[in-house]
Amino acid sequence: MMQYATYSVASPEACASIVWRDSTKSAEAAEAMKLNADNILELNLIDEVIVEPLGGSHRNHDQAALILKNSIIKNLEDLKAFETTDLLERRYTRLMGYGSL
């Protein structure tokens, strides 16, 4: 997951509207939802936080693309060490654990 990306099934405004019936509490909702990459990594929903170029990926697309490419290549190389059945079992176990966060 890119360093400054967010991960969520609903916007903080939607969450605040549902939980507190007040969309103006979106900042509180965003904090509670743990949307940022470091929190998502801590929850074991992702494998890595990919550091972005200074100022964010939107300021230097070429460098961001190169960083992402290198990360993908490295991770694919690491995965080659595993048998397909092992990878599928690891994926299944991980996905089944998401509900117990």
Question: Where are the regions that the model predicts?
Answer:
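Conserved catalytic cores of soluble enzyme domains
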Residues: M1-I73, E77
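Intrinsically disordered, low-complexity segments enriched in small/flexible residues
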Residues: D62-L101
